[in-house]
Each structure stands twice: as C-alpha cells, then as structure tokens.
Amino acid sequence: MGSSSNGGVPPGFRFHPTDEELLHYYLKKKISYQKFEMEVIREVDLNKLEPWDLQERCKIGSTPQNEWYFFSHKDRKYPTGSRTNRATHAGFWKATGRDKCIRNSYKKIGMRKTLVFYKGRAPHGQKTDWIMHEYRLEDADDPQANPSEDGWVVCRVFMKKNLFKVVNEGSSSINSLDQHNHDASNNNHALQARSFMHRDSPYQLVRNHGAMTFELNKPDLALHQYPPIFHKPPSLGFDYSSGLARDSESAASEGLQYQQACEPGLDVGTCETVASHNHQQGLGEWAMMDRLVTCHMGNEDSSRGITYEDGNNNSSSVVQPVPATNQLTLRSEMDFWGYSK
C-alpha cells in the first residue's frame, strides 16, 4: 500500500476524524483491503518508534498538528498468550482505565483503549504526557481476520494538556506582580511620609529652656497665634509710682527681647520664648495696670480724671484728655495677659 506524502493534501487541510469515522471508515477499509481516495494515515510499527518520533513520521500536509494518526499491527507479547507487546526502545505503553465502547446510531462498532507512555522499563517507569487512543473493531466486523494474529488497529497519539502546571505558572506570575506592586506602593508611601516630615519640620519649634513646645501643625494650638502686641504702652502723661515705672521699663525691655527672638515674617506666637523668670513675676503687675486702665475707660466722657497723692498727703486731681485708643488693641492685650495667668 502506498503512503501519503506531505504534498498529497490540499493547502489548509486539517485531519480531525471522529471515533466513529476512524472505526467505521478508515479501519474497516484497512482490514478489508479497500483503496482510500486519499491516504492520510500511515502504517507504523509501534514497537520501533518513540512517541516524539511520530510527529515527523505521521505528519499530514504543512499545517501544524497537535495529534497524529497511524495504523499499527498488534503483535502478541508471548506466542501462547493474549497480551500485546507495546514496548519500545525508550519505554513502554501502559493501558489505563477501562475500554470505551464506540457506537454508531444503532449498534456497537468497536472499542477504544487508552494508554500512557512511560520511560524506562516496567514496572518502574517514569510517566510522561504522551497519550494514545487505540481503536479496534469487533470480531463480527472483521471477517478476514486471521485467528493467529490480532489484526490491525488505528491509533491517535497526542500530548496531554497539563492545565495544573499552566494555572500554577499563571498564579505564580500574578503573585510576583502583586508583590512587586505592593513593594512599589510601600516605597511610595515611605517617600510621601518622608517628604511630609521634611516639609513640616521647620514649623515645629521646640524651646530649649523650658517644657513648652510650639507645634503649629496641631489645630488645637491655633489660639496661641496672636498679633504682635509686645510694644511699649503709650504714655498717659503721669507716673503711678517709681516701682511701676521700673516695672514698665523692665517689661518694655523684655518685650524687645521677644521681638528680637522672632524671625522676620513670623508672628509672636510662632517665636521661641526668651523671657526670664522675672518677666513671669511682672505679669501680675501688668494685669493690675490693665484693670486700672479699663476702669478709667468705662467713663462716659472722653476725658479721664486721675487722682494721686504727693509726699505731703495732698491729693489733687488731674483731668487730661486722652487720645483715642484702639479698643481692639487694648482688648487683645487684656485677653493675652489674662490667658498668660
């Protein structure tokens, strides 16, 4: 019987017969010596070829294939036995599972056996992904079968699709991508936090002398920001006493120290405190003076009468017009000294 050649089929030809077509058409014609219109299935000695050699031997046309077909003659393993010899030089074919019955629309036409190729020698072989389906006809359909031999079979060989490995490889690549994204996200968060710390560090001023800390990034300390009020009080044209004058000069000098400690462009509330302990003692006297000024401001007229005593216990009253004072500035001073207490 002639063999088909690679150029014996038209371009784009794909050979993919069903189980029924393999048995009822191809194998039945083979055992009855009928001629094929196009010979696409070759005769192969299964005991002399390895599965990976069948790809080139059983190739049909130029179209890529993932399964290969051939006719094979079943040889008995032992002359007096019924077992079939399916050993090759590199390994052997081992049957697995039960044979499947192939039927057409009305009757049974043959059987299909599934075999797996193992490398090495039985019973210790290494399983591979090569699978073979072996089709055989029923004895009633093979009237010319010789009782001394088992006859012809048609086989389909292919490689098992190992979906488990594909899924594992895909999941491992996805896991590595997620880990890479997670590391990149962590790096971005660290850079953002670092830039935030560098950005806010100039506004966190800590006093070196005491325990007070000014942190402008806290909203609950927003009340500490006051307009610059450390200036010398306006003169009212009289002296309360020599002690009050000294206290006034001391407070004015301390106010200048506050102004010098401030950086240009910053409010008083954002500066470092450099006043000494003596200033804390003078706060009470300043509050007393503010109360006195507030009491005199409560008069309805625009002038202020101030009474004082001289050294001879002679009291006199001085009425002197007071220039208009910014009420908001005085209120701010009062609130500040009240808050400092």
UniProtKB/Swiss-Prot annotation:
GO terms for biological process: plant-type secondary cell wall biogenesis; positive regulation of DNA-templated transcription; positive regulation of gene expression; root cap development. The keyword Chloroplast does not apply. Residues 9-160 form the NAC domain. Expressed throughout the root cap, in both columella (COL) and lateral root cap (LRC) cells, with higher levels in the COL-adjoining LRC than the upper LRC. Also present at low levels expression in the tips of cotyledons and the cotyledon vasculature, as weel as in vasculature of the first pair of true leaves and at the hydathodes. The keyword Phosphoprotein does not apply. Pfam families: NAM. It is found in: Nucleus. Keywords: Activator, Developmental protein, DNA-binding, Nucleus, Transcription, Transcription regulation. GO terms for cellular component: nucleus. GO terms for molecular function: DNA binding; DNA-binding transcription factor activity. Residues 109-166 bind DNA. Disulfide bonds: none annotated. InterPro entries: NAC-dom, NAC_dom_sf. Its main location: nucleus. The NAC domain includes a DNA-binding domain and a dimerization domain. Transcription activator. Together with BRN1 and SMB, regulates cellular maturation of root cap. Promotes the expression of genes involved in secondary cell walls (SCW) biosynthesis. PANTHER family: PROTEIN CUP-SHAPED COTYLEDON 2-RELATED, PROTEIN SOMBRERO-LIKE ISOFORM X2. This is Protein BEARSKIN2. It comes from Arabidopsis thaliana (Mouse-ear cress). The gene is BRN2.
